[in-house]
């Protein structure tokens, strides 16, 4: 019976989270009140606060779920993929991993749209979000950094360019990853997907011998094709 009560509690928790997710996506996080969430879940506000005392807690829960899904989908930890360090992978596999990672980030952005559309505002107004997003940004940037550095050291990326140039590139990727979504409604921006923008951004950094492999992988993994003339300039 205690197990049953525990299950029911868990089910109610999930139901509240689903209702909050729907409302946040439909109305926007700022607009939704705890009263609305309770009504949508068909419970009293007092019952709702038993599970979640503040609206922020619901956003945090949502973000936790999305982050877990993302982490599972890529199995990436600091400097390791599926338990193996970056340097144990072949060059081509590393390049593939970078592109697959971009795709996973794009999917994550879609799932977390409500968060990303309000990214800078939420960072200022929701303390718990500020903390989570800092850790999260760090985690994603560590992976970008690790993969790009490894590819640069192996000359898949142009080694004659100083590492400074790549730090600048990584900073641009960071802006597109975390703030690109805020440009919603900007027609020019929305003409291209996140992955396509990054694939194009990386082109001039790819060393000549890897150009063909890179373009093949971009097409296979990210469904991005380049004009022949563009490639002539690399």
Where are these regions (language model features)?
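C-terminal peripheral helix-coil segments that are non-catalytic and often amphipathic
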Residues: 149-150, 182-234
């Amino acid at each position: 019976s205690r197990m049953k009560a525990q299950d029911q509690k868990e089910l109610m928790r999930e139901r509240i989270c689903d209702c909050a997710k729907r409302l946040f996506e439909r109305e926007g996080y700022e607009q939704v009140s705890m009263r609305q969430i309770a009504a949508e879940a068909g419970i009293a506000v007092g019952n709702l606060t038993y599970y979640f005392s503040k609206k922020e807690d619901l956003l945090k829960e949502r973000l936790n779920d999305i982050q877990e899904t993302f982490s599972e989908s890529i199995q990436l930890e600091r400097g390791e993929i599926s338990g193996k360090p970056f340097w144990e992978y072949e060059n081509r596999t590393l390049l593939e991993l970078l592109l697959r990672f971009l795709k996973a980030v794009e999917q994550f952005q879609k799932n977390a749209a409500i968060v990303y559309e309000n990214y800078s505002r939420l960072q200022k107004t929701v303390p718990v979000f500020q903390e989570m997003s800092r850790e999260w940004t760090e985690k994603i940037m560590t992976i970008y950094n690790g993969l790009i550095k490894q590819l640069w050291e192996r000359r898949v990326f142009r080694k004659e360019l100083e590492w400074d140039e790549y730090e600048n590139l990584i900073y641009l990727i960071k802006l597109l990853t975390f703030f690109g979504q805020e440009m919603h409604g900007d027609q020019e921006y929305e003409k291209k997907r996140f992955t396509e923008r990054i694939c194009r951004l990386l082109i001039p950094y790819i060393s000549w011998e890897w150009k063909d492999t890179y373009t093949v992988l971009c097409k296979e993994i990210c469904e991005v094709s380049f004009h022949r003339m563009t490639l002539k300039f690399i």
